[in-house]
């Protein structure tokens, strides 16, 4: 199967690659070593439309397709795996769940600040009587 990237997908990939190399990568090892949360970088990523990529524009997102999202995530991951995990959870678990399963009031209240990087979502998992280990 051959996938031909569109001009827009290539533009997104290149923009994120430049951002990742110039902003994310330079202090990635130090952030990981010191366990510093990359809040300032995530805010910049929100301003670039990377924190709610597949969320429709009417909710503050970029309205990007899945291929564009994966290309962007791959470029962030190449620069810093932990920053990519935050981006992935924000886009895939938090924003997508709200978009598909949230009420209209929840979408209006939460999606725009999440998609624009003003708020960071979280993932929690419980399994009664079984324990949970989402890392493994």
Describe the residue ranges of each PLM region.
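Intrinsic disorder at enzyme termini
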Residues: 1-10
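A non-catalytic, amphipathic alpha-helix used as a structural packing/dimerization or gating element
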Residues: 11-22
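Glycine-rich flavin
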Residues: 23-136
């Amino acid at each position: 199967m051959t996938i031909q990237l569109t001009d827009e997908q290539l533009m997104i990939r290149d923009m994120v690659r430049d951002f990742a190399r110039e902003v994310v990568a330079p202090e990635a090892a130090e952030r990981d070593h010191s366990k510093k949360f990359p809040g300032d970088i995530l805010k910049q990523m929100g301003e670039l439309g990377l924190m709610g990529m597949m969320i429709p524009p009417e909710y503050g997102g970029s309205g990007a397709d899945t291929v564009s999202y994966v290309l962007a995530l791959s470029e962030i991951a190449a620069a810093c795996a932990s920053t990519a995990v935050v981006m992935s959870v924000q886009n895939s678990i938090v924003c997508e769940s709200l978009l598909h399963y949230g009420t209209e009031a929840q979408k209006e209240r939460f999606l725009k600040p999440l998609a624009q990087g003003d708020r960071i979502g979280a993932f929690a998992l419980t399994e009664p009587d079984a324990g949970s280990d989402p890392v493994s």
